[in-house]
Amino acid sequence: MKRAIVLSGGGSKGAYEAGFLLAAKELNQHFDIVTGTSIGALNGALVAMGDYEGLEYTWNILDMDHVFNNAPDLTDLKDDFMTTSLFNKEEGSNLSELKESIAQQTSLAQSFLKYYFKNKGADNTPFVEHCRGLMDEERLLSSPIDFGICTVQFPSMKACYKTKSEMERGHMLDYLLASSACFPVFPMTEINGNKYIDGGFSDNLPIDLALDMGADEIVVVDMHLIPVHPQYINRPSILYSCPPVDLGGFMDFNKDALERNKRLGYLMAYKLFGNYEGNQYTFLPSNQTVFHDYYKQLLM
């Protein structure tokens, strides 16, 4: 029986995943397989290596200065700006609200593109160097936990799935960066002459990859209010979780936002594994005997 955890992409919302994963470790939840896309791939690699200290450290210190050199403020840029889901998610909005939202997102994107072209590309050197300091190929390869990621080949836009055994030695970090290369916010990654961009352009939540790797039971950490793969909800062998509230923009590295999301992920893990209860709020497990006795007295 192999148990997997699947981690979605979402940029700075990865703090939510970090909180979830740290809580899962506290609860002694064991996983034989970890798969992830984008920030989920980066968080997942640390879990596969057993480096929970590195995971916690990353989300304690991460801010915009640890991601880019001299980048504009992209706090409110939505992770679905470049997809039609922007329109789908706002079907309930009136036309003026929709226009305002699109105008705001366009303005943010234009601000970034000015920075991008002025500097001949986005300089994400701080983020790359931080990841390099954490990545240990031998530790990942020798781990009993199998690991896989999703990235996308460019310009074919074809999904590319890689397990750790399929990644060329010396390029494991490159594949992690490729999976999280949310172009054009992040530059493309080139590996052996092939260009790759963020796996979220194809599969932002690689559940099928976990199944292909032999998972019998799967825990899913989806960071979207609207599930990425609703077809997997309520499956007997899949525990599928989504956040109870919107986690904000995918480039929001404000400390308060990161701490909030990390706490939300932490509480979600405790609820998913049956230690806490609630949806919008969190409660200790209810004592059904107390409720039974109370209502019995009312009826007598």
Q: Model segments located where?
A:
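Patatin-like phospholipase
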Residues: 1-37, 45-300
